[in-house]
Every structure is written in C-alpha cells, then in structure tokens.
Amino acid sequence: MVLSMEIRQLIVAYARSKGDICALAQVSRDFQVVAERFLYSTLDLSGTDATISVCNVLASQPRVAAYVEILTIAVRDEETAGEEELSPHLPEEYWRSMGAGLRSTHRLMRLTIQVDYIGHSHHAWVLDRCQFKLRTFHCDLAWDDHLVGFLNDQDELEDLYILDFPYPVDAEHPTSTEPQRPLSPPPPPVRRVVSPVPRAGSLPKLSILECPTTDAVSALVPGRPITRVKTCFATSDIETKRRELTALFVNLRLSARPLLSLDLGDSSYNTDCTLNFLRHCVSANRTMDNVRYLGTLALPVDGREVWILPSHCFFFAYLIIMF
C-alpha cells in the first residue's frame, strides 16, 4: 500500500521526537524525503562541536542541504566558559565548516549568526560565494568588505539586523583630552574612518533595519524602501547627540517608503532628550506622518513640559504605542 504525500507528512508531523522521525526516514525512500525535510528545514545550532558536525553534513550532502530554509548559528560565552582560558578564539575548523555548509544551502531564506564570543570579529568571509537569497538576516559579524559584498547580492532581503558598524573618527572631534606641551609639534590630523557601504541599487526590498549607530542608518536607508528603523546614539554627549539627531532625520527623509516605526535608543533617557526628539519628529512631519511606534521614551510627568507634550503628539495621527 502506497501512502499519499499528505498522509506521510501528517505521520511525520505527529512524531513525538526527532529520534522517531529519524527512524521513519529509514522505513522507505518516500518517508525519507518527508522526514529529512522536516528535520532539516529549520536548524538551530548552538555550540562549537554541533555546528561543525552539522555544517560538515550540509557540505557533504547537497540533497540534505537543499532542505534548509531557516538556519540559526549561535555560540555564547557561557557555553564555552571552561574552554575560554585554553583557547581565546574559536577554532578555524569552526569557521571553515560554517562557510562550506552555508555555500551548500541554496534555498536558505532566514539566517541568524550570533557568535557572542571573544575573537569572533572579521569572519564574514564565511558568506563569500553563497548563492542563497535571504529574506531575513541577523548577525553580529564585524562590518567589513566581505559582509558588504554579501549584502550587495541580497536582492530579496527585507529584514536586516547588524550589531557592528565602525564608529567614525573625525579630526574636528578628537578623543584625546590630554594637555599638549607648548613647544611640542602638533599631532598629525586624525583621518575619518571610511566604512564600506553597499552599492547604490542594492538591497532593493529592505524594509526593516536594526543597527547599532545612526551612522549605519545614513549608509543603509537612503534610496531603500525602509519603513522600520531601530538604532541608538553613538555617544552620550548632548551636543553630539543633537547633531546625530539632525543627520538621522535627514537620512530618514531619503527612504523610498514612508516610515512606520522609529526606535531610537539612548544611554541616558530623560525628558529633555525626549522632547528634543519629538520636536525633530514634528518638524519632519512628511517623514513621520504614518508613524505608529516611537519606541521607549521618558515622558514628563510634571512641570511645563507636560503641557508641551500633547501639542507634539497631536501631529501623529496613526501613533499607536508610545511609552
């Protein structure tokens, strides 16, 4: 008796454990296809050894790799606390196997790489020569030419989360506060760090962006249909934050779609910052006309500022949540 595909899928779906599904995969070739698709369509890999093992399977068995649509790779400090003293870096085999596995997953749609581990920076080369077209990509890899080159090829990407973006260093705002000797020669000028950015026309479907600084917003928002932005100030200095805020709204105006959500993190939440933020929102009314969410705000509870707040909120006709 030959079971239909629908019945085989129901049997696999009601299996109690992955061990039972593995056993079903050995019953017949028909069950093998359904069971393997169920096992490998969504993979959540945590730990060095497990990641190496599964990625080696994907690299050596293209048939299995073709089932993978959602992949999460994570290694955290607490998982490797006992090994950290002996090896401060993840082994090269970890990165090689990850790269080989990723290059074999041609149907991948959602990828998350969270390697919260010392020495993880500058390993975005694992994304080189990958052929999949993602819808969602979350990573904490270092922002470099490899990561930017990968993003340049992601024509279907809609949701992007990055944890790293180089902080600019400007000669007009030196970080050193040490006094200079009167007769010492002036220090050489500090050159601004130029970060690689995706080329114009890339990421044509990007609509959700979560990034660590407003500088990343200026690199990724203009010309793209971004409707939801989550970012934060790069500094706690009030004057610098004002300049950042002005530049942020200039870049938000350059989005190809109306903004629906803006969440701006601040290391020092206070009412002055909130009111300044709302003033910028009001002055950028065309950009903010359709906004429904403004993140976490420190609202005034007494004084004259309480009466100023309604006049600002009046302009947000569609605002749903504001705490």
Model-predicted segments: where are they?
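Leucine-rich repeat
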Residues: 1-323
